[in-house]
Amino acid sequence: IKKILKDKKKIMIFLDSNHTEQHVLAELEKYSKFVKAGSYIIVFDTMMEDMKRHHFKARPWDHGNNPRTAVWKFLKKNKRFKIDKEIQKKLLITSCPDGYLKCIKN
């Protein structure tokens, strides 16, 4: 991945696989190092934090353990990224609230 992306000026990474906090946090930590200032990581299905507890039956993720809680933990440690609320405002409806992460410095 590093070799493929080394000469790219803008990079957009989409995270939408396993939705547990632990998994998404690991993805954010791994892939964030490839993202340059002005580029984005989009974390999907952060709306899970807004759902009722036990809404997702037979799934390991739930309220309190999901992509949005991973984003919040990631941003506490990584000051290179911020939530871009402007995208969320333009879309009005999204499955990714707080999931549009803009890289603000290299």
Model-derived regions: residue spans:
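S-adenosyl-L-methionine
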Residues: 1-7
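Local beta-strand N-terminus motif with an aromatic residue
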Residues: 9-11, 38
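A short SAM/SAH-binding and catalytic strip from SAM-dependent methyltransferases
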Residues: 11-21
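C-terminal substrate-binding/active-site "lid" region of AdoMet-derived donor-dependent transferases
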Residues: 21-105
